[in-house]
Structure formats: structure tokens, C-alpha cells
């Protein structure tokens, strides 16, 4: 443990079959680079926000006066359901193929000032139930359904209203997980959860059904994996009522810890990975998969200093300064049952500015 805390080394990510350079000694360097405005919770949200209940969107469509979740087709989709076939390639270096799909927007709550950390467990449970319904609907037609949330302007979110996106298209590669299953006869992430529970070095949160860890191979400073403990669910549609309720609870607690770390509305990209879907899919057909969520937050030292994936990261391999163990310890030390907006004073709850 002392070695990985004090000396540079590389770590292997078996999910992506790639390596991450960890350079803990760089945590001591002074920062004189770009800073961001601290992401704050909205105390006075825009009354004309196009995602709020009853608002009119850019295309003239009016939202209903929804009181819980609300799903609608993305007004500016990246994927369309009807597209022509591309021309045949004239050289093997210039190959393209048809891409079909659909994009939806899902609002979590009618109030633009809300975030997951501020919502009630029952309100978050309604979000999870809608995710399951959307996966069941789109998964019957598409091989991959990607549910993801970009939170905060620093992550490219153009609207601060609590919402996510759902893109249905082709599925992501899963060869590494399949190869591990063929070699060991067990799902890679099932084994990984067992090992993290034994080592107890990177656990942030745990309840009766789920565990949150900073993965051993984390690329982003406070990246986390949200994993089920039992039952080996392959997709969100496999979750039991108890798993869904416990998921709502741990999501609220994790997001509260994130916000409390630097006393800000913590930005991130998050999303769900599960077994591919499609008309040919059926229960239990992808035993190498374990459904899980990934949180990828950019903040590094404070609410104003972010991690940039540039230069070496783009041209060679991912590099990080803070070790995953240090990040897990910092998050684990933050309160999960009380939000920073109910505290007084500034700075973060660990006394680090």
C-alpha cells in the first residue's frame, strides 16, 4: 500500500484491456492552470427552462404538467430510425455502415432546482422504474440501450434541469468480459466485487444490495462503480423490487457524498452498462455480464479545479495523480445522510480548500 501511495506505477483495466498511469507524487505540485466557476445548486432556477413542467421547447412542443418523470423524443437526436444505406466502400480503409437508432430525453423531476442528491428516495425510485420501462421498450428493438446523465456545464450539459438521455443503437464491445468468463467460468465483475469486499481498500458505500467502489483502474479522480452484491442481474430489467429500492437509497447517498466533498453541485457523466438487448435476447443469455453504473466526475482538487484528459492521455494512455485508494478514503469520509446545503461555512467537509 505504501508503494502505490508514494511511487508511480501502471494499473490494468480488464474491462477495457488498457493501462492507467498513476503518479501520486504529482499531488504535491502547485496548480496555476485553468479554474472553473464553482458549480452551485440553483436556488432560483430559470422560470423559462424548456425542460420544466408546462414549458415550451425550442421546437414548439409543450411539456405536460408532469409531477414525476417525463420522457420525450430528443428534439435534436444524434440517431434517427430511418436512414438510407451508405454507398459501398471503394477501399477497405474507407468503410462505413448504416447506423439506426433513436434518442430520448428523460426528466427526473418537475423542479429545475432538484438533483439526485436533493430528491427523496421515492422520487429516485420513480427514476429507476422509468429506466427499467425504457430499457424494456427500446431493448426489444435495439441491441444496445445507453442510459446516461451529463450533470453540470463542465460536462457539457446544456440544461441544468435534472434529466438524462437514452440512446438506443448498436451495443458496446464486451469481448474482455466474455474472454474472462470463458477462462474462469465466472463473470469478471462478480469476481471483482468479491475481491473488493475482501480487500476493503476502495469501498465508498455499501448497503444490503449494492456497493460503491472507486475502481482499482479508475481514470477520473473520483470515478466510482456502482455494483449489485447478489443475484447476478445482467440488465436493469432483472432487478428485484428490493434491489431497486436499495439502488435508490445508495444513489442518493453517493450523490450526497459527491456534493459534500467540495461543497458544490458535483458534476459528472454517469451511465449504465448491462447485457446487450434486441429481439433475440432473453433472460440469462449473457452470463459474463453484470449490470453496473459508472460515475465519471472531472473535479480534481476543489470545486474549481478539474482534471483535463489531454496531451498524454489522448496520445498515449490515461494518467491520474490521486490514487484510487486516496479518492475512496476521501469520499468515504464525507457524510451521506446530510447535504452540505444544510451546513454552515465554506470549503469542503474534510477541511481541504
Model-predicted segments: where are they?
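Charged catalytic carboxylate motif
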Residues: 130, 246, 250
Amino acid at each position: 500500500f505504501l508503494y502505490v501511495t508514494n511511487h508511480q506505477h501502471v494499473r490494468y483495466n480488464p474491462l477495457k484491456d488498457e493501462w492507467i498511469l498513476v503518479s501520486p507524487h504529482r499531488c504535491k505540485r502547485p496548480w496555476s492552470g485553468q479554474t472553473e466557476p464553482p458549480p452551485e445548486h440553483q436556488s432560483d432556477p430559470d422560470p423559462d427552462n424548456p425542460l420544466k413542467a408546462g414549458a415550451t421547447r425550442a421546437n414548439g412542443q409543450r411539456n405536460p404538467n408532469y409531477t414525476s418523470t417525463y420522457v420525450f423524443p430528443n428534439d435534436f437526436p444524434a440517431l434517427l430510425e430511418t436512414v438510407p444505406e451508405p454507398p459501398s466502400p471503394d477501399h477497405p480503409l474507407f468503410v462505413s455502415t448504416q447506423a439506426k437508432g433513436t434518442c430520448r430525453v428523460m426528466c427526473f423531476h418537475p423542479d429545475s432546482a432538484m438533483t439526485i442528491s436533493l430528491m427523496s428516495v421515492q422520487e429516485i425510485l420513480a427514476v429507476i422504474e422509468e429506466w427499467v420501462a425504457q430499457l424494456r421498450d427500446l431493448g426489444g428493438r435495439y441491441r444496445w440501450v445507453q442510459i446516461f446523465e451529463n450533470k453540470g456545464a463542465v460536462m457539457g450539459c446544456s440544461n441544468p434541469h435534472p434529466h438524462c438521455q437514452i440512446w438506443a443503437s448498436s451495443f458496446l464491445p464486451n469481448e474482455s468480459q466474455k474472454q474472462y468468463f470463458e477462462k474462469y467460468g465466472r463473470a469478471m465483475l462478480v469476481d471483482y466485487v468479491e475481491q473488493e469486499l475482501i480487500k476493503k481498500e476502495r469501498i465508498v458505500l455499501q448497503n444490503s444490495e449494492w456497493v460503491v467502489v472507486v475502481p482499482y483502474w479508475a481514470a477520473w479522480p473520483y470515478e466510482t462503480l456502482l455494483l449489485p452484491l447478489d443475484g447476478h442481474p445482467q440488465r436493469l430489467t432483472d432487478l428485484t423490487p428490493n434491489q431497486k429500492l436499495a439502488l435508490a437509497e445508495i444513489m442518493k447517498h453517493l450523490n450526497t457524498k459527491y456534493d459534500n466533498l467540495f461543497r458544490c453541485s458535483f458534476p459528472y457523466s454517469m451511465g449504465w452498462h448491462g447485457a446487450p438487448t434486441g429481439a433475440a435476447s432473453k433472460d440469462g443469455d449473457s452470463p459474463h455480464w453484470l449490470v453496473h453504473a459508472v460515475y465519471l466526475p472531472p473535479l480534481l482538487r476543489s470545486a474549481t479545479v478539474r482534471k483535463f484528459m489531454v496531451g498524454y492521455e489522448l496520445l498515449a494512455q490515461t494518467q491520474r495523480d490521486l490514487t484510487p485508494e486516496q479518492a475512496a478514503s476521501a469520499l468515504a469520509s464525507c457524510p451521506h445522510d446530510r447535504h452540505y446545503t444544510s451546513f454552515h461555512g465554506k470549503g469542503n467537509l474534510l477541511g481541504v480548500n
